[in-house]
Amino acid sequence: MLNKAMNIADYDPQLFKAIEDETRRQEEHIELIASENYTSPRVMEAQGSQLTNKYAEGYPGKRYYGGCEYVDVVETLAIERAKELFGATYANVQPHSGSQANSAVYMALLKPGDTVLGMNLAHGGHLTHGSPVNFSGKLYNIIPYGIDEAGKIDYVEMERLAVEHKPKMMIGGFSAFSGIVDWAKMREIADKIGAYLFVDMAHVAGLIAAGVYPNPVPHAHVVTSTTHKTLAGPRGGLILSAADDEDLYKKLNSAVFPGGQGGPLMHVIAGKAVAFKEALEPEFKTYQQQVVKNAKAMVEVFIERGYKIVSGGTDNHLMLVDLIGRDLTGKEADAALGSANITVNKNSVPNDPRSPFVTSGVRIGTPAITRRGFKEAEAKALTTWVCDILDDANNPAVIERVKGEVLALCAKYPVYA
């Protein structure tokens, strides 16, 4: 019999210390990585439940194991809430990650060797959109599109490439692009050549759910997302569609299970159900509106301080700071800011002369700081400190001063009060 009083602290102090150290790091560091966020205690409660014990291969009502009557309720709640949240007629909540959701779409719609039009990783795309080091770039013939000199998606060039190469699938979405994507224009191009339009909305799913960023679901044949990032749920994946195509839905379900996964993670699916319910609340829209306000406030300060922002601004939760021409690499900026308890990630920028391991850019996002309660005033003060360090990254006195400011602000705005 298992005793409910069992705990990690008494049994495994080494592991417990690592967990406690990470908890303290999150409380004492300002998180500016655009893909990170803080999930709610309700989501964590679901993930720590006895649902983790249950195998449930298959789908609600069609399982390969007995005893699934209650996990069927959990998964159905998640499915129906996801559909309501995004205006979809189909949802699959089983993918373990965004990358696995994307893999399932490739498997459902394509054959190895088929041509795919996807956003260049160096211009803001994602590994799974055709990077040569990823399965997508290894198994499929990838034609990359990118942004123009103004930092905007070049739809004229996209259409030219589509007409020339006739891809079977076009991919919309990004991991480092701060503008608005014209989903309707992409669908128009896809229809012109008879291609599928697949949108990976992982980065902006929360903004879309709240109505502060255009929804691709009415335009794309299929849409994927992560459930963390701006959605602020558990780490996981999601597939959606409003194509009203039962054959497509069956292909997508089969590509997830049994095509790419076995048993779903029912405790994570419960966490997704909670997060979708939270995202349907009015305060979630207020949160997402503030995410964008904070991002715009940060961009304003960066530009005032003489820093170049790719695309010239932001219309979502992120910005890409271009350090080309400065005596500072993305890797060095990442390390210097980290020393002051500000967490960012180095990132390639368009026409980057440096390797992806060094880079000439820094990607910054506002979902996590907004979740803590930061508004424009805090976002602007924080950006001033970031610029102070970028201006003088090798000055320990500047780093120590900023670290003190960061610790004081973190104490004022705890992640979990």
UniProtKB/Swiss-Prot annotation:
One of its GO terms (molecular function) is pyridoxal phosphate binding. One of its GO terms (cellular component) is cytosol. Pathway: One-carbon metabolism; tetrahydrofolate interconversion; Amino-acid biosynthesis; glycine biosynthesis; glycine from L-serine: step 1/1. (6S)-5,6,7,8-tetrahydrofolate binds at L121, G125, H126, L127, S355, P356, F357. Keywords: Amino-acid biosynthesis, Cytoplasm, One-carbon metabolism, Pyridoxal phosphate, Transferase. Its main location: cytoplasm. The record marks H228 as: Plays an important role in substrate specificity. It catalyses: (6R)-5,10-methylene-5,6,7,8-tetrahydrofolate + glycine + H2O = (6S)-5,6,7,8-tetrahydrofolate + L-serine. Belongs to the SHMT family. Catalyzes the reversible interconversion of serine and glycine with tetrahydrofolate (THF) serving as the one-carbon carrier. This reaction serves as the major source of one-carbon groups required for the biosynthesis of purines, thymidylate, methionine, and other important biomolecules. Also exhibits THF-independent aldolase activity toward beta-hydroxyamino acids, producing glycine and aldehydes, via a retro-aldol mechanism. This is Serine hydroxymethyltransferase.
